[in-house]
């Protein structure tokens, strides 16, 4: 039996701010706000609006959608959401999934193959995803105790490295907001390039970070660690409604020699606490779908024992047959190189070759 759909309503910026103000205790991810949608627009992307979902007059959830027009797979993506204002039960989530299917199948302005969002209680038609989205685990640092207790809760290794960084002359500065884009482009992006090359990942280009700093400046901090006047490590944090996130960071080889990233993050915690934030999420640690995050997980575990599991991102197909056909095609494309290698190995061995010893 298909669950009864919720009533849904698109929210203007004023509507969203009114809803948020009426629910001060709910953690709303910055990615689920109109301010993040403005940032996406500045990048040339297509925010499709924020909707609220109601059970009668009771607000259940909200979701901000980003339209994607990738070849053969048009979709709507909810980044780090939806936001839940009531208990996230299996029944409530099933109703939201059914509502989203009905909502966008009937929307003449968009024809997505699927909607992608975080789902905690997975049941049909939820499936996939074709590729993974948001990280699934994070470490959270409680900023409500006094600074001495926060520091004492770190692992001994972290406390020692912070002290060593101070003795080695590492200096942490908060960059003036009007200089963020310039400083990032000329001094900090090269550190990101070095980090990406060293750790084997692809970073965004400098324009992405500069746009982030320009468009979301009211909700960001940029802090930099210097050694002998030279920047060696930097971080960007976000803040919204008292919850901060350690969002982007990079460090040079010189930073590692001086333990600068440890002192930098500690100084950031103190600044965030002073600004009224009650917690800081160190987003993105090792999980089943993100084993490559082992190294950063080791670093982040130094600052808190609290690990929070975030619901995994899944797909909600609106056109199941087309979705399954695409899923099969993508799987075959991923498997093709391995299949080709096995065929080549077999040809080299020849028809009389044996697979193992007698």
Model-derived features: positions:
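A conserved beta-strand-loop-helix scaffold within acyl/acetyltransferase catalytic domains
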Residues: 5-55, 62-72, 119-132, 150-255
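Short, polar/flexible loop-turn hinges at active-site or ligand-entry regions and domain interfaces
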Residues: 84-90, 145-154
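A structural signal for short, well-ordered beta-strand segments and their strand-loop junctions
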Residues: 111-118, 173-174, 224, 279-282
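Aromatic (often tryptophan-rich) hydrophobic motifs at membrane interfaces
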Residues: 77, 94-103, 209-324
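Short, high-confidence coil segments that cap the C-terminus of an alpha-helix
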Residues: 46-48, 109-112, 274-277
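Glycine-/proline-rich flexible loop or hinge segments
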Residues: 74-88
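Active-site/acyl-donor-binding loops of N-acyltransferases
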Residues: 2-16, 69, 120-149, 278-358
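Non-catalytic accessory segments adjacent to catalytic cores
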Residues: 92-137
């Amino acid at each position: 039996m298909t669950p009864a759909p919720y009533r849904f309503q698109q929210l203007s910026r004023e509507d969203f701010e009114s809803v948020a103000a009426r629910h001060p205790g709910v953690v709303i991810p910055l990615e689920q706000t109109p301010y993040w949608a403005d940032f996406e627009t500045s990048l040339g992307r297509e925010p499709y609006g924020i909707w609220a979902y109601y059970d009668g007059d009771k607000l259940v959830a909200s979701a901000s959608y980003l339209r994607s027009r990738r070849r053969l797979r048009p979709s709507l993506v909810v980044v780090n959401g939806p936001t839940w204002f009531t208990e996230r039960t299996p029944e409530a989530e099933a109703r939201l999934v059914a509502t989203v299917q009905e909502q966008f199948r009937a929307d003449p302005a968009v024809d997505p193959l699927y909607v992608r969002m975080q789902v905690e209680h997975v049941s049909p038609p939820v499936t996939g995803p074709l590729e993974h989205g948001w990280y699934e685990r994070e470490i959270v640092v409680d900023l409500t105790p006094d600074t001495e207790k926060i520091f004492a809760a770190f692992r001994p290794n972290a406390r020692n490295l912070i002290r060593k960084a101070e003795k080695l002359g590492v200096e942490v500065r908060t960059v003036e907001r009007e200089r963020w884009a310039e400083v990032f482009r000329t001094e900090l992006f090269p550190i990101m390039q070095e980090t990406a090359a060293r750790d084997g990942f692809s970073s965004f280009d400098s324009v992405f970070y500069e746009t982030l700093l320009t468009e979301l400046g009211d909700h960001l901090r940029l802090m930099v660690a210097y050694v002998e006047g030279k920047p060696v490590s930097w971080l960007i944090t976000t803040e919204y409604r008292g919850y901060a996130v350690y969002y982007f960071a990079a460090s040079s080889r010189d930073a590692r020699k001086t333990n600068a990233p440890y002192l930098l993050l500690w100084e950031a915690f103190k600044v965030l606490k002073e600004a009224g934030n009650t917690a800081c999420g160190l987003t993105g640690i090792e999980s089943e779908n993100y084993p490559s995050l082992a190294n950063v997980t080791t670093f982040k575990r130094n600052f808190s024992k609290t690990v929070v599991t975030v619901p995994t991102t899944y797909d909600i197909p609106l056109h199941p047959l087309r979705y399954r056909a695409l899923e099969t095609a993508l799987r075959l494309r991923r498997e093709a190189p391995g299949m080709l290698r096995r065929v080549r190995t077999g040809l080299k061995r020849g028809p009389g070759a044996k697979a193992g010893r007698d």
